[in-house]
Amino acid sequence: MKKSFILWMGVVLMMVIGMSSCSSEDNFVTNPNKEEPIVQTDYFYDYDGIKIPLTLNEDKALISVPKGFDMVSERILATVQPFYIVPDTFFDMFFITRADLEKLASMDFWEEDAKSVIITPSYIIDDDRGEFYQQVYLTPYLLVKLKKEEDIDLLTSYIEKYKLQITYHSTYFPLSYTLSVTLDSEKSPLECANEMFESGNFVWSVASKAYPASGAD
């Protein structure tokens, strides 16, 4: 993965350490094979000891197309105009509106193409006091830190359980791993990260979020 992207995700990591969710049953278009989006709003993350809610923004989403599915990406770009595109090594990542997502869903090709994409939601972070407000987008990635190097087998068991993949690991930070959900994953990155963190087996496990360039949305 490109260094700039890793550094960017590292900053995100420091902001959202300790993320937790009230419910893991529903998500918003995490599994593209589902017929309809399912709206679930009661997500939270811990920031400086305060549990801050994540409110689902139903109007925007992020479509991630694994590299190698070039025709899928081309059909998306020929049908809608993403308001921002994330440079990434493993996915073509397109920020789109809900109207664009509905337009894609109306196309004949989408029934098949939807099997080759990962769609993740946008959230509004608001502490209800006006002190912190940010719109963020859930990416396919999650960031995990082991307690000790010998826990790699434990991590592998979770990778197999959630059908994840390792996308980045540096020998300079042997305990830290960047994972991603795959087309076979049945849970969202947020659900996977929360459940891994709540297991108590890891120093941290957080879903990575993206922020479009200023003015992009």
State each model region's role.
Residues 1-9:
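Bacterial N-terminal signal peptides that target proteins for export
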Residues 5-6, 16-40:
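Bacterial Sec-dependent N-terminal signal peptides
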Residues 13:
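Phosphate-proximal small/polar/acidic motifs at interfaces that engage nucleotide phosphates
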Residues 31-55:
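Post-signal peptide N-terminal segment of mature Sec-exported envelope proteins
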Residues 57-59:
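Terminal targeting/pro-maturation regions of precursor/exported proteins
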Residues 61-93:
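N-terminal, post-signal-peptide region of Sec/Tat-exported proteins
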Residues 73-80, 106-108, 156-161:
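Short, aromatic/basic amphipathic alpha-helical patches
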Residues 86-149, 157-158, 165-217:
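Autoinhibitory propeptides
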